[in-house]
Amino acid sequence: MTDKLPLALFLMGPTASGKTELAIRLRQRYPVEIISVDSALIYKDMNIGTAKPDERELSLAPHRLIDILDPSESYSAADFRRDALQAMDDIVAEGKIPLLVGGTMLYYKALLEGLSPLPAANPEIRQQIEQEALTKGWSVLHDELKEIDPVSAARIHPNDPQRLSRALEVFRISGKTLTELTQTKGDSLPYRVKQFAIAPKDRAELHRRIELRFDKMMEAGFEEEMKALYARKDLHPDLPSIRCVGYRQMWEYLDGDCTRDEAVFRGICATRQLAKRQITWLRSWNDLTWLDSDNIEQALETMSEAIASD
C-alpha cells in the first residue's frame, strides 16, 4: 500500500548547517519543489535575523510557506500541517516531489504523526488563569497541575508560565489532562517519506558557523530590521515572532535591558542552544540518513541516489 503513496523528502538539521544550499542544489538537478519547515521564516519583514533565503536564492528555488504572516500573528503546528499538506498535494499534482526543508522539529512531528486533539485556546479561561497567577503565584498553580497531571508537571518548570498556563487551560476546557490528550495521535502522513538530516560532524564547527552567521546578520542590518519592528508599537516580547532566537535578544537591547554587544552574545548563545535542541530531537528520530555539512557534494549525491532509486 505504501508503494502507491507519493514520495516526499525531508531535509532537516540544526540552524546554520547548510540546508538551504543543499536544497537549492537538489532543485537544480531534480523536479523537486521546496516547502519551508521553519517557524521563523513564516513572518514577513523578518528577513535578516531569520537568515531567510535572499532574492537570488528564491529565484533559483522558490520556497513555499515563507512570508505568509505578519509578525503580530500566531501560527500553530496545526496551521502548518494544514498548509504543508495542501502545498504537498499541489506539488504532487504538478508531477513533482515535495522537499520539506527546515529545522522546526515540532512541525515535522506534526506532519508525520498527526496532531493530538487538543482544544483551541480559550481567552476567558486563559485570562482567569493569569489572574489566579497574579493573586496566588505560579508556584501554587504548578502545585495544582501536579495534582491533576503529574507527568506534565514534571516536564513543565514553575517559571514557564506559557506552558503551565496551557496545561491548566487544556484540563479546564476538556476535563482531560494534557498527558492524556497528547498520547492520542491524529492522522499519519499519506506519503512515502525519505528523511535526511545535515549537520557538521564537529560541534565546534557548528558553533563557529552560528557565530559567523550572526556576525554577518549584524553587518547586513539586523539591528535596523529590529528597530523597524520595535517602532511598530503593536509587537511585544510575548509574541512568537519576537520570541524567535536573535529577535528576543535584540528586543531586550532596544528595551534598554542590555548593551548591543550583550544582545549579540546572548543571541549567539541562544542560537547554539536551539541547535543543541534540534540535534537532540534528530538523534531520537527514526529512519534518518545523516549528511555531513562539510561535504555538500557527497550530501547531494546521497540525496540524488535516494531519488533516482525510487
UniProtKB/Swiss-Prot annotation:
It comes from the Bacteria. InterPro entries: Dimethylallyltransferase (IPR039657), IPT (IPR018022), P-loop_NTPase (IPR027417). ATP binds at residues 13-20. GO terms for biological process: tRNA modification. It catalyses: adenosine(37) in tRNA + dimethylallyl diphosphate = N(6)-dimethylallyladenosine(37) in tRNA + diphosphate. Monomer. This is tRNA dimethylallyltransferase. The lineage of its organism: Bacteria, Pseudomonadati, Pseudomonadota, Gammaproteobacteria, Vibrionales.
